[in-house]
C-alpha cells in the first residue's frame, strides 16, 4: 500500500533534482533517457519484416506510411502503470526508428468496460488503483516524462550527438494522436507532445492533478502554450474539464469529427501529412522547440519536477484524495 511506504524514494527525487540542476550532468541524463531501448533495437528488424508486434500492454502496427502505437490496458480503460510503461516506450522507439514509415500515430485500443463496449478509449491516465496500492514507484513518473513522452516530443537520441536543438539533434518523426472517448491526466499530457490531434466530437480532456495530489508530468510546462496561463491553472489546479469540441478544446485538438469517422479521418490526415513527403517535418519540429521548449528548459523544469513530485507522491494528501475522489480503498487490482 502506498500509505505504508516509508518514503525513502524521496531521496531519489532529491538526488535526480540535483543532477538535473547542473547543466552538464542534467543534459547528459536527458540524452541518456532519449536513447532507444535495447529491446527496440533488437526487435526493429522484426517489425520491419512483419509490420506488427504485440507486446501485450502495447502494440505497434504499420498502416501504410504510418507506424501506429496503441496502448492496450483494457481492464483499466487504457490507464498507464508499471506494466504498460516499458512496452509503450519500446513501441514508440520502434515507430520512430522504423525506416518503412514516415509518421507515427498514438491510439488507445479497445477496452472491456461495458459502458464503452466495442469502443476504443485513448487514455484514463495513471492507474489510480495501482497508485493507491503502492504499485507505482516514484521513478515511474520520471522515466515516463524523460523517456517515452519526451521521445514523442523530441525524437530518439544517438550516443554520439547531443539531442539539443542548437548543438545536435535527434532522429524524429511527426506524431498524430487519435483521441477516442477521453484523455485524462497522462493521456492529456501525451496530446501536448503531439504535432496533430484528431478527436471525436464526444471526447474530452482533463488534468485532475488536484484530485490526484500529484504534478501532471510536463503539463505545467506545456499547457500554457495552448490555453494561456489562466485556463491552464483552471485545468490543473481546479480540475476544469475541456470538451474537445469547444473553443478551448480546439486549441489542443486540430480536427473534431464524428466518433464513427475516426479511423477514416486519421488515415486521411496521415495521407495529407505524407503525400508530399515529410522531409522538412523534423526540421520544423526542431525550429518550434528551439523557441518554445529547448532541451535546457526541459532540464530545468525536470529539476523542479523530480523534487516536488517526490514530496507529492508520499504526501498523506495523496492517499486522502484517492480515497475521497476515487473510492480507492474499495477498488481491487
Segment roles from a protein language model:
Residues 1-64, 111, 243, 264, ...:
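C-terminal alpha-helix plus adjacent terminal tail
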Residues 73:
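Active-site donor-nucleotide binding/catalytic segment of nucleotide-sugar enzymes
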Residues 80-85:
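Phosphate/oxyanion-binding active-site loops and adjacent basic polyanion-contact surfaces
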